[in-house]
Amino acid sequence: MKFKILFTIILFVFASLGSADELRNAVESKDRSEKNIVRDEFRKPYETLSFFQLEPNMTIVELSPGGGWYTEILANFVRKSGNLIAAHFSKDSERAYFRNSRINFEKKVKENNLYEKVTVVDLNSELSDPSSVDAVLTFRNLHNWLGPNMDKIFSNTYIALKPGGLFGIVEHRAKVGTSMEAMK
């Protein structure tokens, strides 16, 4: 009996180390751009993504990936056994910045095999089939959604997540006393 318990604990520890190694490999990958690697010192991607306890076989949604800074790491992390869904601005947005951001992101995804497991969807649409996603992540975007968009994005997130799924939010810190109106 003691052997079985010890064996189970050892298996769990090694399984956890495997995920950590795969995450570290994704963060330290030669596939990452120098421009993005320079930001690691400030964004601390290994520590951030480790906190979320992600596994490489997960289906992960990244909300508002922008130029793909975290996408570059996440795509590599899930490449062998998981999936990454990038929920980006609509191609039909009235704002040229949003349209161009989406066009540039899709071009980046199509031109590099690193992104072969990345699917791009509209941020304000269904993210995936209901209860099919292990984790939804967003990085420094929440303040951009203040207002009616936030309700839609949160609702779509809730619908897409599996029971017990993770919604991970990394956000800027406002100065103490900053009003919600000033953050909009």
Predicted region positions:
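A short glycine-rich, Lys/Arg-flanked "PGG" loop and its adjoining helix->strand segment in the class I
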Residues: 75, 151-166
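A short, conserved alpha-helix within the catalytic core of class I
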Residues: 122-123, 144-157
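Conserved class I S-adenosyl-L-methionine
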Residues: 57-66
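A short acidic, Gly/Pro-enriched loop at the edge of an enzyme's catalytic core
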Residues: 126-136
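Class I SAM-dependent methyltransferase Rossmann-like catalytic core
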Residues: 23-51, 55
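Conserved beta-strand signature within the Rossmann-like core of class I S-adenosyl-L-methionine
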Residues: 85, 164-172
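Conserved Class I S-adenosyl-L-methionine
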Residues: 180-184
